[in-house]
UniProtKB/Swiss-Prot annotation:
Compartment list: Secreted
Primary residence: secreted
GO cellular component terms attached to this protein's record: extracellular region
PTM comment text: Contains 1 disulfide bond.
Keywords for this protein: Disulfide bond, Secreted, Signal, Toxin
Protein name: U-scutigerotoxin(01)-Tl1a
Residues annotated as signal peptide: 1-25
Keyword Secreted: yes
Family to which this protein belongs: Belongs to the scutigerotoxin-01 family.
Organism: Thereuopoda longicornis (Long-legged centipede)
GO molecular function terms attached to this record: toxin activity
Length: 52
Protein backbone atom coordinates (compact mmCIF):
# COMPACT_ATOMS: atom_id res chain seq x y z
CA UNK A 1 0.00 0.00 0.00
CA UNK A 2 2.78 2.42 0.93
CA UNK A 3 4.73 1.59 -2.24
CA UNK A 4 1.66 2.28 -4.37
CA UNK A 5 1.18 5.66 -2.68
CA UNK A 6 4.84 6.50 -3.21
CA UNK A 7 4.68 5.64 -6.92
CA UNK A 8 1.57 7.80 -7.32
CA UNK A 9 3.36 10.66 -5.59
CA UNK A 10 6.37 10.27 -7.87
CA UNK A 11 4.14 10.32 -10.96
CA UNK A 12 2.44 13.48 -9.69
CA UNK A 13 5.81 15.13 -9.13
CA UNK A 14 6.94 14.13 -12.63
CA UNK A 15 3.83 15.73 -14.12
CA UNK A 16 4.66 18.92 -12.24
CA UNK A 17 8.25 18.79 -13.48
CA UNK A 18 7.14 18.29 -17.09
CA UNK A 19 4.73 21.21 -16.77
CA UNK A 20 7.38 23.51 -15.35
CA UNK A 21 9.84 22.43 -18.06
CA UNK A 22 7.31 23.31 -20.76
CA UNK A 23 6.80 26.74 -19.20
CA UNK A 24 10.50 27.45 -18.66
CA UNK A 25 11.26 26.43 -22.26
CA UNK A 26 9.62 29.68 -23.38
CA UNK A 27 12.02 31.64 -21.18
CA UNK A 28 15.08 29.83 -22.58
CA UNK A 29 14.62 29.42 -26.36
CA UNK A 30 18.29 28.42 -26.71
CA UNK A 31 17.48 25.03 -25.17
CA UNK A 32 14.93 23.08 -27.24
CA UNK A 33 12.06 21.63 -25.25
CA UNK A 34 12.53 18.23 -26.89
CA UNK A 35 15.82 17.53 -25.14
CA UNK A 36 14.44 18.59 -21.76
CA UNK A 37 11.39 16.39 -22.29
CA UNK A 38 13.62 13.43 -23.19
CA UNK A 39 15.60 13.94 -19.98
CA UNK A 40 12.37 13.87 -17.97
CA UNK A 41 11.25 10.69 -19.73
CA UNK A 42 14.62 9.03 -19.07
CA UNK A 43 14.43 9.86 -15.37
CA UNK A 44 10.86 8.55 -15.31
CA UNK A 45 11.94 5.26 -16.90
CA UNK A 46 14.84 4.87 -14.47
CA UNK A 47 12.49 5.49 -11.53
CA UNK A 48 10.07 2.85 -12.81
CA UNK A 49 12.94 0.39 -13.25
CA UNK A 50 14.10 1.05 -9.69
CA UNK A 51 10.60 0.29 -8.43
CA UNK A 52 10.73 -2.97 -10.39
Amino acid sequence: MLAKAMSLLMMFLLVLVIGSVMVSADDAPACPVGTKYDDVLKSCRSLLELQG
